[in-house]
């Protein structure tokens, strides 16, 4: 059986935690930041946790993480 391919786009965006969950950075924080509130930008710095419904898809996309 051949090796499964890792989805490279997903591999660059998601990290797996020690407990097996996935985390990623928030969107909307690369440009056009002047109109966004400081509190909103500060909260966007935090890591975003992936919901359980989407974790199964990531398991298939990232078989070796």
From Swiss-Prot:
UniProt cross-references to HAMAP family, sorted A to Z: Ribosomal_bL35
Biased composition (Basic residues): 10-44
Keywords associated with the record: Ribonucleoprotein, Ribosomal protein
Gene Ontology MF terms: structural constituent of ribosome
Highest taxon of source: Bacteria
UniProt GO cellular component terms: cytosolic large ribosomal subunit
Segments for region (Disordered): 1-65
SUPFAM superfamilies per the UniProt record, alphabetical: L35p-like
Ribonucleoprotein recorded as keyword: yes
NAD listed as a keyword: no
Bias type Basic and acidic residues, positions: 50-65
Annotated protein name in UniProt: Large ribosomal subunit protein bL35
Signal peptide: none
Family: Belongs to the bacterial ribosomal protein bL35 family.
Annotated source species: Xylella fastidiosa (strain M12)
GO biological process entries: translation
Pfam families hit by this protein: Ribosomal_L35p (PF01632)
């Amino acid at each position: 059986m051949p090796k499964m391919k890792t989805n490279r786009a997903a591999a660059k965006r998601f990290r797996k935690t020690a407990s097996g969950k996935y985390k990623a950075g928030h969107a909307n924080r690369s440009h056009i930041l002047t109109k966004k509130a400081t509190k909103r930008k500060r909260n966007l710095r935090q890591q975003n946790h992936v919901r359980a419904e989407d974790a199964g898809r990531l398991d298939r996309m990232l078989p070796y993480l």
